[in-house]
Amino acid sequence: MTISNLLKQRVRYAPYLKKVKEAHELIPLFKNGQYLGWSGFTGVGTPKAVPEALIDHVEKNNLQGKLRFNLFVGASAGPEENRWAEHDMIIKRAPHQVGKPIAKAINQGRIEFFDKHLSMFPQDLTYGFYTRERKDNKILDYTIIEATAIKEDGSIVPGPSVGGSPEFITVSDKVIIEVNTATPSFEGIHDIDMPVNPPFRKPYPYLKVDDKCGVDSIPVDPEKVVAIVESTMRDQVPPNTPSDDMSRAIAGHLVEFFRNEVKHGRLPENLLPLQSGIGNIANAVIEGLAGAQFKHLTVWTEVLQDSFLDLFENGSLDYATATSVRLTEKGFDRAFANWENFKHRLCLRSQVVSNNPEMIRRLGVIAMNTPVEVDIYAHANSTNVNGSRMLNGLGGSADFLRNAKLSIMHAPSARPTKVDPTGISTIVPMASHVDQTEHDLDILVTDQGLADLRGLSPKERAREIINKCAHPDYQALLTDYLDRAEHYAKKHNCLHEPHMLKNAFKFHTNLAEKGTMKVDSWEPVD
């Protein structure tokens, strides 16, 4: 076959050029029930050519439900995994996913899914925890990894994400490398720590966000590599939801809080390394910081979005570490237009390092994430709507919130339903599912205000959250619930964290029955 000049330039290890294949030539390698690893994190840096070829094969041969795989990715993959879900090609998926087709398949029971702390998922995979049912002692049959270059020693230069690729390659029987020639080479911005298992594991030596070990590519045994495939498809990241009055209000509350912490000496003037999740609230917070005159900021996070480019360009941000650069097409164009300056202030690491509790605590990270709901005592649900319907997965929120110096959650105070513009309260009497406990959360912010929960007892937290964060439509209801719960608990000598179990989920049951959480009354309790 003809090898493009671009591919020859990117693949600097000559023996690999003898392994160049078209994606469709690899179809016979894939068998029903295999265990696959994909590169990628938050929809970027994922393989495209081989997954698409497998979709075409399933479509042409009516193999829906007959060619299915156990699929492991560092976090969410690109649109390919949703097409795999639509074609019934996934048996099991972990640890995080984004997209309506795959979430629908999970909630209909057609895909078995488990989520896991992203700092732990790759290492637990290498331990064999997720493949205990295998009889051949293998972990992964194939890892399909996207590269933007291959160095002279055969090692892999990833693209805009690292994720769990180092661990996947270590425990994979065979490796397929997709070299993406539609994306510029990312060589020089990665820092790769290869997995070392206990009892031989050593502490990560990093003391600042820009410290590095100096390994900028992923080592791989060339004998494992069965094929090189050229990919010419760029990552498809949809446009970000623009900030609105709600998200800007949250950002304003946070900026004011940070200024007050600096004023009282609890934070330095350049704050501490920032972690921010995904979504329009997270983007609005970063946009707010860009206009807040904070200088010499640093970032230690999972994912960098377009809003961080503003911080780089206005000189506010000195350095950022992440495991993924999830930029829209316009965002990548902005980054590549100023690539020489940009790449020296950015480091992409594996997710076991970016999300590592040891590093998060040592650096004193300020963590900011968005929950589904938070109850009056500060237990947060990040994953399961009404306790049962999976959204995306836990992700890295708990990695950061459990270990950060400041653990912050932000959310709208209310969301609309079909029958009520404020039919869903983010603040509920009892969370229908708990991912982050009351012991993990320092600050809660909604468009209504900011609740500082540090050092408060449960009853004090409840009053603070209701008064500062609940939507006005729900403040009286929540206060009434708390008053009644305290009255009941006082009679029964259980006043530490008062609840009425008979009414604890009445917001949720009322929503299911009437389309709103605005309950008419509480059940009487003795």
Curated annotation (Swiss-Prot):
First-listed, main subcellular location of the protein, grouped into a coarse class: cytoplasm
GO CC terms in record: cytosol; mitochondrion
Binding residue positions for CoA: G277, I278, G279, N280, I281, N392, G396
GO BP annotation list: acetate metabolic process
Top-level class of the enzyme under EC nomenclature: hydrolase
Alphabetical list of InterPro entries matching this protein: AcetylCoA_hyd_C, AcetylCoA_hyd_C_sf, ActCoA_hydro, ActCoA_hydro_N, NagB/RpiA_transferase-like
Residue(s) carrying N-acetylthreonine: T2
GO molecular function annotations of the record: acetate CoA-transferase activity; acetyl-CoA hydrolase activity
Alphabetic keyword roster: Acetylation, Cytoplasm, Glycoprotein, Hydrolase, Phosphoprotein
Residues annotated as catalytic: E302 (5-glutamyl coenzyme a thioester intermediate)
TM spans (from-to): none
Catalytic activity of the protein: acetyl-CoA + H2O = acetate + CoA + H(+)
Function, as annotated: Presumably involved in regulating the intracellular acetyl-CoA pool for fatty acid and cholesterol synthesis and fatty acid oxidation. It may be involved in overall regulation of acetylation during melatonin synthesis.
Name of the protein in its database record: Acetyl-CoA hydrolase
Organism placement in taxonomy: Eukaryota, Fungi, Dikarya, Ascomycota, Saccharomycotina
Name of the coding gene: ACH1
